[in-house]
Curated annotation (Swiss-Prot):
Modified residues (Phosphothreonine): 176
Keywords: ATP-binding, Cell cycle, Cell division, Kinase, Meiosis, Nucleotide-binding, Nucleus, Phosphoprotein, Serine/threonine-protein kinase, Transferase
Enzyme class: transferase
Catalysed reactions, semicolon-separated: L-seryl-[protein] + ATP = O-phospho-L-seryl-[protein] + ADP + H(+); L-threonyl-[protein] + ATP = O-phospho-L-threonyl-[protein] + ADP + H(+); [DNA-directed RNA polymerase] + ATP = phospho-[DNA-directed RNA polymerase] + ADP + H(+)
Lineage, uppermost ranks: Eukaryota, Metazoa, Chordata, Craniata, Vertebrata
Protein name (record): Cyclin-dependent kinase 7
Entry keyword annotation includes Heme: no
Protein kinase domain location: 18-301
Gene3D superfamilies listed in its UniProt record: Phosphorylase Kinase, domain 1, Transferase(Phosphotransferase) domain 1
Family statement: Belongs to the protein kinase superfamily. CMGC Ser/Thr protein kinase family. CDC2/CDKX subfamily.
Gene Ontology MF, one: RNA polymerase II CTD heptapeptide repeat kinase activity
Residues spanning the membrane: none
PTM (free text): Phosphorylation of Ser-170 during mitosis inactivates the enzyme. Phosphorylation of Thr-176 is required for activity. Phosphorylated at Ser-170 and Thr-176 by CDK2.
Source organism of the structure: Xenopus laevis (African clawed frog)
Record note on quaternary structure: Probably associates with cyclin-H (ccnh) and mat1 to form a multimeric active enzyme.
């Protein structure tokens, strides 16, 4: 981590240390490249943070990037992405990470792959182990979703993209509720809670587990109101007795009393131990929601089948561009194939 702490290093010479090999993807806040470290011959991923908003960077500092660097410098766990280097000037910052072969979103969407109960258990075990480590250090991830769960060539899953991560624990600290991608956002966040804890990450884990089982997003809402409607229609509308304090949340709206569908009728192939875990993750009262440590002690993880070792987990059978083409065809979208297709059209969306 010597490179991260260095000051006054010439940015151009630092950047020349890395040979760009491929464009991996572009998000709202960053562009990601595959590169080779010329000094070590190691394959890495470089996340170039885009210039922040004027208000955020008016003193020449991208605070989101600095927060991500600061947090990642303090973390060391097999299931957390490794920050290898960081360099930049003012609000232009590049972060260098372990290169990861794929992500859980790609695995879920690759219909040529069969995900067995042992595979799913392995993904959940690694996710929860990384999350337990974070929560023990009083850090919330706040943006868990399948494409932020990366997999290396050995099948090791690592939590990534800590741009929204935050330390927690102060009883009087107020947080923003505009975190977590909507489909994985917990009910308390959707109701505008400004004080929350590990429950926001655990609800997201439940949504990811459901997506692994169903192979489609579990609760794909179009707006915050639609998201809450889908949650309550599916899982039932909670009462004040089930979730004390619900009606006092800043953006609370009373909903029709939906009965919901029992989990065993939604996840028809799930055993009692898996249903017990899902029930714990989808508990409406965030104070009673299952924690990462509690989840790892559930009988689901000690019962058979045992989790599949990482090196035996499935890997994408087709190229990313072929996978995207298949998804478009499934949606009835015809795409014209052309020679020399723009790299941006076939680039994999990958966040670090």
């Amino acid at each position: 981590m010597e490179g991260i702490a260095a000051r006054g290093v010439d940015v151009r010479s630092r950047a020349k240390q890395y040979e760009k090999l491929d464009f991996l993807g572009e998000g709202q806040f960053a562009t990601v490249y595959k590169a080779r470290d010329k000094n070590t011959d190691r394959i890495v991923a470089i996340k170039k943070i885009k210039l922040g908003h004027r208000a955020e960077a008016n003193d020449g500092i991208n605070r989101t990037a600095l927060r991500e660097i600061k947090l990642l410098q303090e973390l060391s766990h097999p299931n957390i992405i490794g920050l290898l280097d960081a360099f930049g000037h003012k609000s232009n910052i590049s972060l260098v990470f372990d290169f990861m072969e794929t992500d859980l979103e790609v695995i879920i969407k690759d219909t040529s792959l069969v995900l067995t109960p042992a595979h799913i258990k392995s993904y959940m075990l690694m996710t929860l182990q990384g999350l337990e480590y974070l929560h023990h250090l009083w850090i919330l991830h706040r943006d868990l979703k399948p494409n932020n769960l990366l997999l290396d060539e050995n099948g090791v899953l690592k939590l990534a993209d800590f741009g929204l991560a935050k330390s927690f624990g102060s009883p009087n600290r107020i947080y923003t509720h505009q975190v977590v991608t909507r489909w994985y956002r917990s009910p308390e966040l959707l109701f505008g809670a400004r004080m929350y804890g590990v429950g926001v990450d655990m609800w997201a884990v439940g949504c990811i587990l459901a997506e692994l089982l169903l192979r489609v997003p579990f609760l794909p809402g179009d707006s915050d109101l639609d998201q809450l409607t889908r949650i309550f229609e599916t899982l039932g509308t909670p009462t004040e007795e089930q979730w004390p304090g619900m009606s006092s949340l800043p953006d609370y709206v009373a909903f029709k009393s939906f009965p919901g569908t029992p989990l065993h009728l939604i996840f028809i192939a799930a055993g009692d131990d898996l249903l017990e875990l899902l029930q714990g993750l989808f508990t409406f009262n965030p104070c009673a929601r299952c924690t990462a440590s509690q989840a790892l002690r559930k009988r689901y993880f000690s019962n058979r089948p045992a989790p599949t070792p990482g090196n035996l987990l499935p890997r994408p059978n087709c190229s990313i561009e072929a996978l995207k083409e298949q998804q478009n065809l499934n949606l009835g979208i015809k795409r014209k194939r052309t020679e020399g297709m723009d790299q941006k059209d076939i680039a994999k969306k990958l966040s670090f």
